[in-house]
């Protein structure tokens, strides 16, 4: 009645765990938490994005959008805009309380907690490109969110905004990741740290005035 399927048997051993290799993944967003940090320098704002792929491998990315001194993190804001484009959403909506799962280091298991979340993101599929990074304070490299793309089409945010229909940029990104799957950000690294992003080509046409931006969104 049942027969051995070699691929299924191999996949069984690969299920679960965490994303721990550089590459591209199609993931489902489990939670998008509005994470606020408070310290002596002030308040910082972050998007804590928890994702899972079809093999049940998980990853969590912190995207800082505002430093504790109140200065906006332009790189983080660009990343959030790219995610919105790849999800075909105009905005994240306001954070609202929602139940999410978080790992408790003391009990060493996941627990249900209430957090302020951007629930528009929850359950949506997203393409991500991961580059592994070795950072101070961590024994092993951890996944770094290098780029995002639309899960269904493999179009990048820029291609979506230009209303293009054929993905071209993702292949270039993956060629770069194949060449640099791991970067070492440690201060006492034995090798000089590598840049985490490729220089991006400048747009051929000037950016639209602020008041026209929303009307130019092609979705």
Predicted regions and their residues:
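Short beta-rich binding modules
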Residues: 1-219
């Amino acid at each position: 009645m049942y027969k051995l399927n070699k691929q299924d048997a191999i996949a069984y051993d690969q299920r679960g765990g965490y994303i721990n290799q550089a590459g591209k993944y199609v993931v489902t967003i489990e939670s998008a938490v509005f994470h606020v940090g408070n310290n002596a320098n002030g308040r910082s704002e972050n998007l804590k994005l928890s994702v899972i792929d079809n093999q049940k491998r998980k990853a969590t990315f912190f995207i800082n959008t505002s430093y504790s001194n109140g200065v906006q993190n332009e790189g983080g804001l660009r990343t959030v805009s790219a995610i919105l484009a790849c999800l075909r959403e105009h905005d994240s909506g306001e954070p609202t309380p929602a139940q999410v799962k978080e790992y408790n280091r003391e009990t060493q298991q996941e627990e249900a907690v209430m957090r302020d979340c951007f629930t528009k993101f929850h359950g949506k599929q997203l393409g991500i490109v991961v580059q592994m990074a070795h950072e101070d304070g961590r024994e092993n490299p951890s996944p770094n969110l290098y780029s995002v793309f639309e899960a269904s089409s493999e179009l990048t945010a820029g291609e979506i905004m230009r209303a293009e229909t054929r993905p071209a940029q993702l292949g270039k990104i993956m060629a770069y990741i194949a060449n640099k799957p791991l970067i070492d950000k440690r201060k006492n690294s034995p090798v000089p740290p590598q840049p985490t992003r490729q220089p991006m080509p400048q747009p051929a046409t000037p950016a639209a005035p602020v008041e026209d931006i929303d009307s130019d969104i092609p979705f």
